[in-house]
Amino acid sequence: MDHTYQYSWIIPFIPLPVPILLGVGLLLFPTATKNLRRMWTFLSIFLLSIVMIFSLYLSIQQIFLSCIHQNVWSWTINNEFSFEFGYFIDPLTSIMSILITTVGILVLIYSDNYMSHDQGYLRFFAYMGFFNTSMLGLVTSSNLIQVYFFWELVGMCSYLLIGFWFTRPIAANACQKAFVTNRLGDFGLLLGILGLYWITGSFEFQDLFEIFNNFILNNRVNLLFLTLCAFLLFVGPIAKSAQFPLHVWLPDAMEGPTPISALIHAATMVAAGIFLVARLLPLFIVIPSIMYIISLIGIITVLLGATLALAQKDIKRGLAYSTMSQLGYMMLALGMGSYRSALFHLITHAYSKALLFLGSGSIIHSMEAIVGYSPDKSQNMILMGGLTKHVPITKTAFLVGTLSLCGIPPLACFWSKDEILNDSLLFSPIFAIIACSTAGLTAFYMFRIYFLTFEGHLNTYFINYSGKKSSSLYSLSLWGKEEEKKLNRNFGLVPLLTMNNTKRASFFCNKTYKISNNVRNQIFITIENFGLNKKTFYYPHESDNTILFPMLVLLLFTLFIGAIGIPFNQEGIDFDILSKLFTPSINLLHKNSQNFVDWYEFLRNATFSVSIAVFGIFIAYCLYKPFYSSLLNLTLLNSFQKWNSKRIRWEKLINFVYKWSYNRGYVDAFFKTSLIESIRRLAKQTNFFDKRIIDGITNGVGITSFFVGEVTKYIGGSRISSYLFLYLSYVLIFLMILFFFYFEKF
């Protein structure tokens, strides 16, 4: 065991050789490096697998021995200051390491196929390897300075990966937005770290917690200043985990490749904020006001993310807002002091959401064969539908992930989300109502995504896709961006769908066309010819095995990973793995952890939460499932016509929800108006002051001197005697003025 912990410092550096060798190889031997690109993929997977085995071994030891190991090296700069760096291994570290490596390995396997056509294939794997190193370094850090160092590296990797297709203006803007937003959080985190060091004189976690708690108990420091430092520490996780109000970067981050969304924006990077709050929870927990702020930010994010996901057309943006909402659940649990349930949901959500993102990537990959390589088309759920018979394996995996996220037993997220909902009932009735209501909204928008994507018929061929929208048909695009025309409810839906559309287009002719190699200079990768004069329709196809295999593995995780947190610790049974791993753990709501679970209460609460989820699924079914199948006679719409006043109120509500969701809750607009425009006005005023006032004074002195010289030259007539006469005259006048003022004092 000692040898295992002794060499744990190497964990973050095991994946590092790949990005280093790729960088050197592309610089010195570009042709050979590119020809061996599959070898780099295998090496990345192999090295990350070593870290995974190492992390599993550490976790098994901690389950049975409940030990924490820390090793620190000191670098003494002078007698008063020394920098300490090392590694810290505890259950939280081992859990995060397993999460990073398992999802990372599967994403690397997936990316080998998904990115195979891309000219930046090797650059992608170099970024991925560097990101894995940064994330592993973050979770094994023993002090706040190391955390901040790797925190910044993670942010840099996120910037590079979001802007991977940097020739597309949208992707370039998205990575800049993510970078700037996270810099705001990082600045707050840095101020908090410096403030804590000024108070305690230490960066080490263990020393920091002990000194901080002593200060609080003995009232030896200003509580307001301590609270301010703790809040500044929390600002970093607010930005990194996309919590309100610094969540605005996450949906735009979907402009990166889909495997990045699965790894960084579902399982690891956005979980870094949750990790840091969990790591610093012994510090936050002694300040009740900070704990309440954490829970408040969490519950606001839970509701906001769910409402913003209600009317998204882009499948990845819908999943991004779902991620934001689920991260809010974790932050809520940490704010309530429910350490175990927060980390449990972190684990279950990571695998479920990674499955959903990889499933969406498989769908996008299939749709690109029909609509081209434009994300506006291939990711648009309005153009999908009826994919069940075309991509059955992807559909099954996506359905399991959707059911898990909705909280349907016995899938993974049911167990963790149910714990958070139960704890919210003990913490605050208002928070419990919001959390439970959002569980219903989660089921609604997730099955909205599922129905729009997989049920009905392929909508691509029901829409005039020649660049203009068919007004009558486009009104069927539920909550589309420009849905101006109301649906005429005086005729049935079947004639509307089967009407003759003379401009119906096919998107591939019988010939095969190559993709242009000059990809880097194009905004989108486009197919050279769509054969618009043909009437042959092509349909999506199932993805290759290297795309399906990671999805099936994640499906197994989604089915069974919840078992590690099921409370089996009844009389004669002791099988609660997660509780063993987090012993001793922090829980303000269940202080007596030895009590057995009341299964009657558990079943009652579970029935309530599942009923809410089922109700959300039913509403989604009523609104989205019938349009091509079960409600062909427009029964639902006809029922609304019978109660005209209710129908008007219903339409107003739907329009309000759509506008709220489409405009992102007006948070981006608020930031643009109040912050960005204000900064631009200030920059213009500063530019004016600098050029007109500061430069004006300098230039004015120079111009004045120039004109005085010219006047003097003109008066002197270019003769030395005239210059001497003027010089002596000026000196005489100056002496007379000085003499006059000198004698005036007397």
Curated annotation (Swiss-Prot):
<keyword id="KW-0521">NADP</keyword>
<keyword id="KW-0874">Quinone</keyword>
<feature type="transmembrane region" description="Helical">
    <location>
        <begin position="221"/>
        <end position="241"/>
    </location>
</feature>
<feature type="transmembrane region" description="Helical">
    <location>
        <begin position="9"/>
        <end position="29"/>
    </location>
</feature>
<dbReference type="InterPro" id="IPR003945">
    <property type="entry name" value="NU5C-like"/>
</dbReference>
<feature type="transmembrane region" description="Helical">
    <location>
        <begin position="608"/>
        <end position="628"/>
    </location>
</feature>
<keyword id="KW-0813">Transport</keyword>
<keyword id="KW-0793">Thylakoid</keyword>
<dbReference type="GO" id="GO:0015990">
    <property type="term" value="P:electron transport coupled proton transport"/>
</dbReference>
<feature type="transmembrane region" description="Helical">
    <location>
        <begin position="354"/>
        <end position="374"/>
    </location>
</feature>
<dbReference type="GO" id="GO:0009535">
    <property type="term" value="C:chloroplast thylakoid membrane"/>
</dbReference>
<dbReference type="InterPro" id="IPR018393">
    <property type="entry name" value="NADHpl_OxRdtase_5_subgr"/>
</dbReference>
<feature type="transmembrane region" description="Helical">
    <location>
        <begin position="40"/>
        <end position="60"/>
    </location>
</feature>
<keyword id="KW-1133">Transmembrane helix</keyword>
<comment type="similarity">
    <text>Belongs to the complex I subunit 5 family.</text>
</comment>
<dbReference type="Pfam" id="PF00361">
    <property type="entry name" value="Proton_antipo_M"/>
</dbReference>
<keyword id="KW-1278">Translocase</keyword>
<keyword id="KW-0618">Plastoquinone</keyword>
<feature type="transmembrane region" description="Helical">
    <location>
        <begin position="723"/>
        <end position="743"/>
    </location>
</feature>
<dbReference type="Pfam" id="PF01010">
    <property type="entry name" value="Proton_antipo_C"/>
</dbReference>
<protein>
    <recommendedName>
        <fullName>NAD(P)H-quinone oxidoreductase subunit 5, chloroplastic</fullName>
        <ecNumber>7.1.1.-</ecNumber>
    </recommendedName>
</protein>
<keyword id="KW-0934">Plastid</keyword>
<feature type="transmembrane region" description="Helical">
    <location>
        <begin position="396"/>
        <end position="416"/>
    </location>
</feature>
<feature type="transmembrane region" description="Helical">
    <location>
        <begin position="425"/>
        <end position="445"/>
    </location>
</feature>
<dbReference type="GO" id="GO:0048038">
    <property type="term" value="F:quinone binding"/>
</dbReference>
<feature type="transmembrane region" description="Helical">
    <location>
        <begin position="327"/>
        <end position="347"/>
    </location>
</feature>
<comment type="subunit">
    <text>NDH is composed of at least 16 different subunits, 5 of which are encoded in the nucleus.</text>
</comment>
<dbReference type="InterPro" id="IPR001516">
    <property type="entry name" value="Proton_antipo_N"/>
</dbReference>
<feature type="transmembrane region" description="Helical">
    <location>
        <begin position="280"/>
        <end position="300"/>
    </location>
</feature>
<feature type="transmembrane region" description="Helical">
    <location>
        <begin position="547"/>
        <end position="567"/>
    </location>
</feature>
<dbReference type="GO" id="GO:0042773">
    <property type="term" value="P:ATP synthesis coupled electron transport"/>
</dbReference>
<keyword id="KW-0520">NAD</keyword>
<feature type="transmembrane region" description="Helical">
    <location>
        <begin position="147"/>
        <end position="167"/>
    </location>
</feature>
<comment type="function">
    <text>NDH shuttles electrons from NAD(P)H:plastoquinone, via FMN and iron-sulfur (Fe-S) centers, to quinones in the photosynthetic chain and possibly in a chloroplast respiratory chain. The immediate electron acceptor for the enzyme in this species is believed to be plastoquinone. Couples the redox reaction to proton translocation, and thus conserves the redox energy in a proton gradient.</text>
</comment>
<dbReference type="GO" id="GO:0008137">
    <property type="term" value="F:NADH dehydrogenase (ubiquinone) activity"/>
</dbReference>
<feature type="transmembrane region" description="Helical">
    <location>
        <begin position="89"/>
        <end position="109"/>
    </location>
</feature>
<keyword id="KW-0472">Membrane</keyword>
<dbReference type="Pfam" id="PF00662">
    <property type="entry name" value="Proton_antipo_N"/>
</dbReference>
<feature type="transmembrane region" description="Helical">
    <location>
        <begin position="258"/>
        <end position="278"/>
    </location>
</feature>
<keyword id="KW-0150">Chloroplast</keyword>
<feature type="transmembrane region" description="Helical">
    <location>
        <begin position="125"/>
        <end position="145"/>
    </location>
</feature>
<feature type="transmembrane region" description="Helical">
    <location>
        <begin position="185"/>
        <end position="205"/>
    </location>
</feature>
